[in-house]
Amino acid sequence: GKNMTAYEYGGDILIVDAGIMFPENDMLGIDYIIPDFDYLLDKANRVRGLVITHGHEDHIGAVRHVLEQIPTPVYATPLTLGLIEVKMARNGYNKKADLRTIQAGEKIQIGKFQVETFHVSHSIPDAVGLAITTGAGLIIHMSDFKLDNTPVDGWATDYAKLAEFS
């Protein structure tokens, strides 16, 4: 749980995922736990975007909490973005969020980061991995995935794209 990664390059910051963790049984009175993103608060003006890899709570559950303190564009695939919108509305987030739809296979520039998304199989449809390119090199951010060549949603992991990156 609490999946959240921050990449820094050339003065820019890119956040990937913002999830929650559900408490252990002995954590009475706690509904959920969010990532500690205090490090980013005094650097909020350098955050260029938040990319979400898929719609599970451990990857989207803290989006509202991040946006309340670090207003930044949120990039996600259609299903994932829909889940985020519903969750934010249900939880009373009434600020106008900058939500941007991306498709698997798309390349986008977010500050100094070029982000290319690619299909990955997972237990939820519309999941993507990320190829993040900077002047320092390439980062493959896989997030959650499974090896399944016949997924229910018909979108197997894009092994050819992964081979291109290697």
PLM ranges: what are they?
Residues 1-51, 56-166:
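His/Asp/Glu-rich metal-coordinating catalytic cores
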